[in-house]
Amino acid sequence: MMTEPILQIRDLSVYYNQKKTLKDVSLDLYPNEITALIGPSGSGKSTLLRSINRMNDLNPEVTITGSIVYNGHNIYSPRTDTVDLRKEIGMVFQQPNPFPMSIYENVVYGLRLKGIRDKSILDHAVESSLKGASIWNEVKDRLHDSAVGLSGGQQQRVCIARVLATSPRIILLDEPTSALDPISAGKIEETLLLLKKDYTLAIVTRSMQQASRLSDRTGFFLEGDLLECGPTKAMFMNPKRKETEDYISGKFG
């Protein structure tokens, strides 16, 4: 029996200043899977990711057509509360971006915005989220130190914990390891594989090795088109399109 997708993208196009940068993309995200989005720079991967939790709304020059259905309704309908949407569909960016405050306050930031003040609830959220991001043991004795003083890899895992604290169902990651050293990147990858048990993840990556190690499905983008999408193993072993094969084998990028 086929698993139902948790999110369905249909005929999504994104225009910047009337220029079509994402072209009629249709893609499903499935529960407890990691979907990798690959392709050269400027191919539309990050644009798609930012469309899934309406981050592109912050740019007045962007126009979007098509639909993204989550929880039974189109997230681009006027009745969507984007604040609530971004709690359920969290985002982790390329550069670690902890707030200039303590590790503890970074993690509870979203909960405080919701008006939660109960210390026991906040304490539990901090511990469970930092454990989920595989960094609790490294920071549990210095929760009130500045998050900015952590290493880049630790900062990125605190950013993941900050997303986890709002109890999302989907986590979007835009090249989350590209600014990190190989050891830190490896820890992030291990964390993502653990998170897959409880969440749905979509990751933009420029590393074919990372895509093959982490993802269940892969979508290949070229010049705004989703040229090919399917199970990662099948795509990497036997791509249907020559462009996909050329990109995966490093003939262009």
Curated annotation (Swiss-Prot):
Complex and partners: The complex is composed of two ATP-binding proteins (PstB), two transmembrane proteins (PstC and PstA) and a solute-binding protein (PstS).
Location relative to the cell: Cell membrane
Single GO molecular function: ATP binding
Catalytic class of the enzyme: translocase
Similarity field: Belongs to the ABC transporter superfamily. Phosphate importer (TC 3.A.1.7) family.
Keywords of this entry: ATP-binding, Cell membrane, Membrane, Nucleotide-binding, Phosphate transport, Translocase, Transport
Keyword Nucleotide-binding tagged: yes
Catalytic activity, EC: 7.3.2.1
Biological process annotations from GO: phosphate ion transmembrane transport
PANTHER family: ABC TRANSPORTER I FAMILY MEMBER 17
Reactions it catalyzes: phosphate(out) + ATP + H2O = ADP + 2 phosphate(in) + H(+)
Name used for this protein in its record: Phosphate import ATP-binding protein PstB 1
Domain (ABC transporter) ranges: 7-248
Keyword Transferase included in the entry's annotation: no
